[in-house]
UniProtKB/Swiss-Prot annotation:
Gene (name only): SUB6
GO biological process, one term: proteolysis
Source domain of life: Eukaryota
Coiled-coil stretches: none
PANTHER family per record: CEREVISIN-RELATED, PEPTIDASE S8
Signal peptide boundaries: 1-20
Cellular compartments annotated: Secreted
Keyword Hydrolase: yes
InterPro entries for the chain: PCSK9_ProteinaseK-like, Peptidase_S8/S53_dom, Peptidase_S8/S53_dom_sf, Peptidase_S8_Asp-AS, Peptidase_S8_His-AS, Peptidase_S8_Ser-AS, Peptidase_S8_subtilisin-like, Peptidase_S8_subtilisin-rel
Keywords recorded for this protein, A-Z: Glycoprotein, Hydrolase, Protease, Secreted, Serine protease, Signal, Virulence, Zymogen
Chain positions listed as propeptide in the UniProt record: 21-122
Protein name in UniProt: Subtilisin-like protease 6
Active site: D162, H193, S352
Main function: Secreted subtilisin-like serine protease with keratinolytic activity that contributes to pathogenicity.
Length: 406
């Protein structure tokens, strides 16, 4: 029923230490990737220190006898080095002895298991008119018209971290471009989720910000599967691209990012999300589809992002939507019509569909001259209306509104 990119259940509450950094442990039954870890360095570690550390990891791994993982294949060792505005981390495959040695390093903050990220089932319903655009631009439910300023997010850039985008879809009018791919060698959306999300953010027919530029950042494959470390790698690329390689903040302040994905709470993911917000990029994320407290999910639990729950047509919380104090705002998430690859349409439900409404409003407001970055979420909350019935324990009752006056 619900539709969101999500990881299978995983808890990182427990941890062990080896005379140094915390080694976070997955709960029993968690869908971790065997022998795969994300290592996060302490705040204040310099690029020189990080480089020396990863060089040490590489040399130490090479000196040891070849290790084979659970699938009998040789372990890869260090795979990705990641940098977020002075925050460093890396991912790789290591045996327990190597992880224990890494944890003893004074510059390491914590280590957590890498885990699988997948899509839940897709909900499709034919011939249902979309209602989300009308709802976010009118004060009462039941409308059929979308009211918006003709600026429509012009001059902004929306990064869609997902399954990719069908950039040739006619609804995007040439405004969709391919950014990067961190999961496979197919630079296309062979799943459909990312194209649907992009259509809600900035499609000509279904989009909130109809003139924003859309950038595809693929972190999930055709089956909707990927890894947490791959998602973080995609996040790093967005931050670098939006900040012009670190030399400019002007593009970042006019950039928005959508993550209709998530999983169990991950300190590495939350730290990466905070770095993106700190760089001046507005980040909208899905609250989750488990009808549970979103404080247990990432990146939804990161305070600096704009966490979005899903509402139904009658202004109630969608039955599947997560709730809790981490939720910033509600947006339409039931039976949302948008694009699919090949110029068709699909009707999907989930907080995956709610989040791009907020990402689109972010681009729309920046186009109107509002200040971008994480403070934009406060602007959106201030404009939202307290109309959601039964939002959930400790949860805001505010539904997004674009300020049309209608």
């Amino acid at each position: 029923m619900g539709f969101i990119t999500k990881a299978l259940p995983l808890a990182l509450a427990a941890f062990s230490t080896v005379n140094g950094a915390k080694i976070l442990e997955a709960s029993p039954g968690a869908d971790t990737i065997p022998d795969s870890y994300i290592v996060v360095m302490k705040a204040g570690v310099t690029s020189e220190t990080f480089s020396a550390h990863t060089d040490w990891v590489g040399r130490t791994y090479q000196r040891r006898p070849m290790r084979r993982g659970a699938n009998s294949q040789p372990m890869a060792g260090l795979q990705h080095s990641l940098s977020f505005g002075g925050n460093f981390m890396y991912a790789g495959q290591f045996d327990q002895a190597m992880i224990d040695d890494i944890a003893k390093n004074d510059d390491v903050d914590f280590i957590e298991p890498d885990y699988k990220v997948t899509l839940s089932s897709i909900t499709e319903q034919k011939d249902v008119p979309s209602w989300g655009l009308s709802r976010l631009s009118t004060k009462e439910p039941g409308g059929t018209t979308y009211f918006y300023d003709e600026s429509a997010g012009e001059g902004t850039t929306a990064y869609i971290v997902d399954t990719g985008i069908d950039v040739n879809n006619g609804d995007f009018g040439g405004r969709a471009k391919w950014g990067n791919n961190f999961v496979d060698h197919q630079d296309t959306d062979c799943n459909g989720h990312g194209t649907h999300v992009a259509g809600t953010v900035g499609g000509k027919n279904f989009g909130v910000a109809k003139k924003t530029n859309l950038i595809a950042v693929k972190v999930l494959d055709c089956n909707g599967s990927g890894s947490n470390s791959g998602v973080i790698k995609g996040m790093e690329w967005v931050m670098r691209d939006a900040s012009g390689g670190g030399n400019s903040t002007s593009k970042a302040s006019k950039s928005v990012m959508n993550m209709s994905l998530g999983g169990p709470r991950s300190e590495a993911t939350n730290r990466a999300a905070k770095a993106i917000s700190d760089a001046g990029i507005f980040l909208a994320v899905a609250a989750g589809n488990d009808n549970a407290d979103s404080q247990h999910d990432s990146p939804a639990s990161e305070p600096s992002v704009c966490t979005v729950a899903a509402s139904a047509e009658d202004d109630t919380k969608a039955s599947f939507s997560n709730w809790g104090q981490a939720v910033d705002v509600f947006a339409p998430g039931m039976h949302i019509t948008s694009d699919k690859p090949g110029n068709g349409t699909a009707v999907l439900s989930g907080t995956s569909m709610a989040s791009p409404h907020v990402c689109g409003i972010g681009a729309y407001l920046i186009g109107l001259g509002k200040k971008g970055g994480p403070g934009l979420c406060d602007t959106i909350k201030d404009m939202a209306r307290p109309v959601i019935k039964n939002p959930g324990q400790g949860t805001t009752n505010k539904l997004i509104y674009n300020g049309s006056g209608k």
